[in-house]
Amino acid sequence: MAASYEEERDIQKNYWIEHSADLTVEAMMLDSRASDLDKEERPEVLSLLPPYEGKSVLELGAGIGRFTGELAQKAGELIALDFIDNVIKKNESINGHYKNVKFMCADVTSPDLKITDGSLDLIFSNWLLMYLSDKEVELLAERMVGWIKVGGYIFFRESCFHQSGDSKRKSNPTHYREPRFYSKVFQECQTRDAAGNSFELSMIGCKCIGAYVKNKKNQNQICWIWQKVSSENDRGFQRFLDNVQYKSSGILRYERVFGQGFVSTGGLETTKEFVEKMNLKPGQKVLDVGCGIGGGDFYMAEKFDVHVVGIDLSVNMISFALERAIGLSCSVEFEVADCTTKHYPDNSFDVIYSRDTILHIQDKPALFRTFFKWLKPGGKVLISDYCRSPKTPSAEFSEYIKQRGYDLHDVQAYGQMLKDAGFTDVIAEDRTDQFMQVLKRELDRVEKEKEKFISDFSKEDYDDIVGGWKSKLERCASDEQKWGLFIANKN
């Protein structure tokens, strides 16, 4: 039975009174390696924040000030809030020389906490929501949306799934939730101002903390960035992916067809074949664009001892990828990100890998120029993607392309775009015959398991998959749809 509000607050307060007797970074992070982790993790977290120079910032669960001093150096004004008195006093003793900081002992769940609506540019919290009940998270999310200005941001970071720190604890009342809980609560949060205008939160980013992946092979440290927008704002393509093409049920359906961990053509079989062509070496860094639910990334990290960064625009895909990572202990980090707006430093990756994803991107030349910058000299790109015949598409095929929002090119034109972006040794292969063989095998498997498929999903799902696969085969047989494999180098 869920604890009452008073019981929940007492449990959490007593837990933190016990763990704040020793006011050190080890006590706050509940980890014996805290000092070393902090050196990598704190700069990483701060680097993820939107610009807040001269802005009004609220830090919830400020603790002894691990982030307070850093925030104070840039913020116009900062409120540092914590509900344990001796903890916030310690913070003030360390950071009180910053005259733009107000230190406050208060409980974020208390109705007595008064913050003016529309007064903040950024709300920052690090390990706070996991110490609140589900209902408290929902109520606080609503209040936070009210507190920030339109265009303002909310950043929070939480431990998901299970404990990360190695500190021994008599009891542990922490709520280690699935990331999809936080995504759902904040996505569904809507507020109205006095004039009746409606506002909601748009997800700007969601990723696991790289320092924990690198040092602990742990993907459960996850942060979110949200921006307050008018409810009329169109979230466009991301909403289409998560509500239409890649709904949670649809992803599981695709996974049944492609194999565990995969949502692209051929599953593990084609992954093994194509990854072999990249000549991966231990310690290399790979970017997977459109990583789906992570099967290819886990394979690369485990088999070749590389570090993989998987990005996907679909929140649902990344949620599944994070869940699949539990217990694998591999060097893979995941992020909800748009590859057309994402920024990485030049020369960041040894390999960029993308499977049946770039068909969604309208400006491929711009994306390939970006890939070229992100790759290190000597780096390699490998892409498989839907393509089309050079001839004029039929009305039916044109309608299919339009309905899916695809941007398709013929295989040679696709390869030329890579050359134009600066790549050399470009290989552009028409793999349509292989595509058709794989489609037939996948279709045959689904049809043989018809009763189980319908039992696990539905008759409608079965008909969608069978009809969709047969349509792909027909389009390929009529020389309209193609499948291309592209490999290129950066000298």
UniProtKB/Swiss-Prot annotation:
Top-level EC class: transferase
Q: Cite the annotated pathway.
A: Phospholipid metabolism; phosphatidylcholine biosynthesis; phosphocholine from phosphoethanolamine: step 1/1
Q: Which UniProt keywords apply?
A: Acetylation, Cytoplasm, Lipid biosynthesis, Lipid metabolism, Methyltransferase, Phospholipid biosynthesis, Phospholipid metabolism, Repeat, S-adenosyl-L-methionine, Transferase
The GO biological-process annotations, alphabetized, read as: choline biosynthetic process; methylation; phosphatidylcholine biosynthetic process; pollen development; pollen tube growth; pollen tube guidance; post-embryonic root development; unidimensional cell growth
Q: Where does N-methylethanolamine phosphate bind?
A: Q245, Y246, Y254, Y386, Y400, R404, G405, Y406, K472
Q: Does the keyword Lipid biosynthesis apply?
A: yes
As given in the record, the signal peptide range reads none
Q: Name one GO cellular component term.
A: cytoplasm
Amino acids binding phosphocholine? S159, S164, G165, R169, Y176, Y254, Y386, Y400, R404, Y406, K472
The GO molecular function terms of this record are: methyltransferase activity; phosphoethanolamine N-methyltransferase activity
Instruction: State the tissue distribution.
Output: Highly expressed in the meristem and elongation zones of the root. Expressed in differentiated root epidermal cells. Highly expressed in leaf vasculature.
Q: Where in the cell is it found?
A: Cytoplasm
Q: Which residues of this UniProt protein bind S-adenosyl-L-homocysteine?
A: G61, R66, D82, D107, V108, N126, V263, S264, G290, D312, D338, C339, R355
Q: Could you say which protein family the record assigns here?
A: Belongs to the class I-like SAM-binding methyltransferase superfamily. PEAMT family.
Protein name (database record): Phosphoethanolamine N-methyltransferase 1
